[in-house]
């Protein structure tokens, strides 16, 4: 590892520990030339994943877009900021494990819906309403029916 001060490539590791919930290794190093101490992080390199959009175009997977969409769905629910981050990390891990290089945006959307359905029903309905482009109350009712198995009469009395 190159020293940030003198650019010497000889250093010794003073301390190593797991970081980022086991996803990286933090190493404290000392330059053998100038004795400058610095920290490095070692992570597994992941292959970039391309997302194939509905119109056929592709773009690189963007974790921030995933976070933004899920955060909006989880506003004013019991999801904490930390829980949202962990949820997004889990979705990202599944995407990176399941796909070789390309994944359809529809597959990502369904993966998010499947996971949200288990975690929080309100966030699930909110995400589904945007992802599936609900046009009116009927779309909400049919999704609520599938979520709870309730009859239309029961839902009508609630609404």
Curated annotation (Swiss-Prot):
Bias (Polar residues): 1-11
A GO BP annotation: negative regulation of DNA-templated transcription
Keyword annotations from UniProtKB, A to Z: ATP-binding, DNA-binding, Metal-binding, Nucleotide-binding, Repressor, Transcription, Transcription regulation, Zinc, Zinc-finger
Stretches that traverse the bilayer: none
Cofactor note: Binds 1 zinc ion.
Keyword DNA-binding appears in the UniProt entry: yes
Named cofactor requirement(s): Zn(2+)
Molecular functions per Gene Ontology: ATP binding; DNA binding; zinc ion binding
Domain of life per record: Bacteria
Ranges annotated as unnamed zinc finger: 3-34
One Pfam short name: ATP-cone
Segments forming a coiled coil: none
Domain (ATP-cone) ranges: 49-139
Region annotated Disordered, chain positions: 1-21
NCBIfam families, per the entry: transcriptional regulator NrdR (TIGR00244)
Similarity-based family: Belongs to the NrdR family.
Role this protein plays: Negatively regulates transcription of bacterial ribonucleotide reductase nrd genes and operons by binding to NrdR-boxes.
Annotated protein name in UniProt: Transcriptional repressor NrdR
Organism listed in the record: Prochlorococcus marinus (strain MIT 9312)
Protein's gene: nrdR
